[in-house]
């Protein structure tokens, strides 16, 4: 059974919830995803479960898997450069707090280019523009990183 919970966005949860992805993306009219994950989730096939669904639907994406535990400023900057180079128009984050927080930081800098890096965002609220549209696919419980606009 798929359930729906609304907070900052819409949360689908329950068995088969990932199958909602293609319909959601198509309804929004997005063309290409920037899929932010970590190397272990790629290595163990977790990210592939998502990209297999996307492949079956002919959805374009690029995987960025250089996210480290407790990501650094440089890690976020690398992600910003990769997002820009990808030509993506939305983001999918897969993982725990590190992937979610890195994705949120990347997205806010992409849509607010007046900020050079995450340090320049400290204490700034609200930003001029919202973050890049992001679909969060958590693989852990407890951080709530997928449900908040903040990143640490």
Explain the meaning of each model-derived region:
Residues 1-90:
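ATP/NTP phosphate-donor binding region
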Residues 74-152:
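Glycine/threonine-rich beta-strand-loop-alpha-helix active-site module
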């Amino acid at each position: 059974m798929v359930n729906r919970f609304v907070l900052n966005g819409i949360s689908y949860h329950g068995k088969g919830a990932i199958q909602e992805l293609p319909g959601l993306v198509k309804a929004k009219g997005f063309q290409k995803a920037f899929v932010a994950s970590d190397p272990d989730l790629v290595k163990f096939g977790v990210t592939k479960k998502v990209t297999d669904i996307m492949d079956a639907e002919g959805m374009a994406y690029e995987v960025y898997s250089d996210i480290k535990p407790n990501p650094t400023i440089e890690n976020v900057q690398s992600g910003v450069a990769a997002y820009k180079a990808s030509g993506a128009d939305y983001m999918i984050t897969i993982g725990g707090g590190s992937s979610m927080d890195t994705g949120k930081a990347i997205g806010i800098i992409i849509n607010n280019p007046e900020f050079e890096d995450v340090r320049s965002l400290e204490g700034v609220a609200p930003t001029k523009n919202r973050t890049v549209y992001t679909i969060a696919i958590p693989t852990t419980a407890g951080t709530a990183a997928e449900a908040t606009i903040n990143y640490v």
